[in-house]
């Protein structure tokens, strides 16, 4: 067994290919390739007869392995993210987007790579609110976001679908802001995802990262609904029935994002989506001088 010593955190842990793989994927490298590199690092340490190494030695050896494979840009990104983690820079990521665009899957993958332990879905926040606030007081939070217009009276000359959706977002965003305030106050790494993460209703600070996830056409949404139904108790037909309404909400979210300067990320393939977000985060962190 190889023991890795982290002098800054004053801890000693067994070498883990899984942990190293996660660090390497932050550089935008496919998980399979990252795992192969982590395995090479482990084998070289074993060949050298190493029983104890430092995190600095692991970092340098991994960096060299990336260079040997011609992955110069990836090697640079690897060092960047490792340094960021060493300095304990707080990371807060907010992912918005219409129902079924893949926010939860993207959030899980991002959190794994960034080492963020806290993922909070806005549907969970809404569910808590439903338990403590009666339907008679806030009827909109007791229905699906794309059906809120049925319980909210929209003003004349307004789009009832969007007005109902905005009403629900306005109420749920109170809970989102509370989660954000706690993360800021306590310096916690946090990832918040959900349809209620809407630009303008939730305002990220300069050192926080917000993205709106979208799909190119409704066929992608329909496929997502059926795929999701295979692994959960959600009825795909309920969502397919209202897919046009959901796409209208997506159009609204994309427009809001552009108005507020929030990046819109088209989700066609998971690895590409996650890599795009990580690259954008790295660029912004570098611009901030982090």
Curated annotation (Swiss-Prot):
GO molecular function: ATP binding; kinase activity; phosphotransferase activity, carboxyl group as acceptor
Catalytic activity annotation: (2R)-2-phosphoglycerate + ATP = (2R)-2,3-bisphosphoglycerate + ADP + H(+)
Signal sequence residues: none
The organism's place on the tree of life at top rank: Archaea
Assigned keywords, A-Z: ATP-binding, Kinase, Nucleotide-binding, Transferase
Cofactor: a divalent metal cation
Location of the ATP-cone domain: 1-89
EC number: 2.7.2.16
Pathways involved: Thermoadapter biosynthesis; cyclic 2,3-diphosphoglycerate biosynthesis; cyclic 2,3-diphosphoglycerate from 2-phospho-D-glycerate: step 1/2
Family according to the record: Belongs to the 2-phosphoglycerate kinase family.
Entry function: Catalyzes the phosphorylation of 2-phosphoglycerate to 2,3-diphosphoglycerate. Involved in the biosynthesis of cyclic 2,3-bisphosphoglycerate, a thermoprotectant.
NCBIfam families tied to this protein: PRK04220.1
Protein name according to UniProt: 2-phosphoglycerate kinase
Annotated source species: Thermococcus kodakarensis (strain ATCC BAA-918 / JCM 12380 / KOD1)
Gene that produces this protein: pgk2
């Amino acid at each position: 067994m190889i023991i890795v010593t982290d002098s800054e955190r004053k801890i000693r842990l067994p070498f883990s290919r899984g942990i190293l793989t996660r660090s390497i994927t932050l550089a935008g490298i496919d998980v399979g390739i990252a795992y192969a590199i982590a395995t090479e690092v482990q084998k070289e340490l074993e060949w050298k007869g190493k029983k104890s190494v430092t995190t600095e030695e692991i970092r340098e050896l991994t960096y060299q392995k990336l260079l040997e494979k011609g992955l110069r840009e990836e090697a640079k990104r690897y060092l960047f993210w490792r340094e960021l983690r060493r300095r304990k820079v707080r990371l807060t990521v907010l992912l918005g987007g219409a129902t079924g665009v893949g926010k939860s899957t993207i959030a899980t993958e991002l959190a794994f790579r960034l080492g963020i332990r806290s993922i909070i879905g806005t549907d969970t926040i809404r569910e808590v609110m439903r338990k403590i606030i009666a339907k008679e007081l806030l009827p909109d939070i007791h229905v699906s976001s794309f059906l809120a217009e049925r319980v909210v009276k929209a003003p004349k000359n307004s789009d009832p679908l969007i007005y109902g959706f905005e009403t629900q977002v306005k109420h749920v965003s109170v809970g989102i802001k509370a989660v954000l305030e706690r993360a800021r106050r306590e310096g916690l790494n946090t990832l918040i995802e959900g349809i209620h993460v809407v630009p303008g209703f939730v305002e990220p600070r300069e050192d926080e990262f917000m993205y709106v996830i979208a799909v190119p056409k409704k066929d992608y949404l329909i496929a997502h609904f059926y795929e999701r139904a295979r692994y959960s108790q959600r009825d795909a037909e309920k969502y397919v029935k209202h897919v046009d309404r959901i796409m209208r909400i997506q159009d609204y979210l994309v427009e809001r994002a552009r108005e507020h300067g929030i990046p819109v990320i088209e989700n066609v393939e998971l690895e590409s989506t996650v890599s795009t977000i990580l690259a954008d985060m790295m660029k912004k962190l570098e611009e901030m001088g982090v």
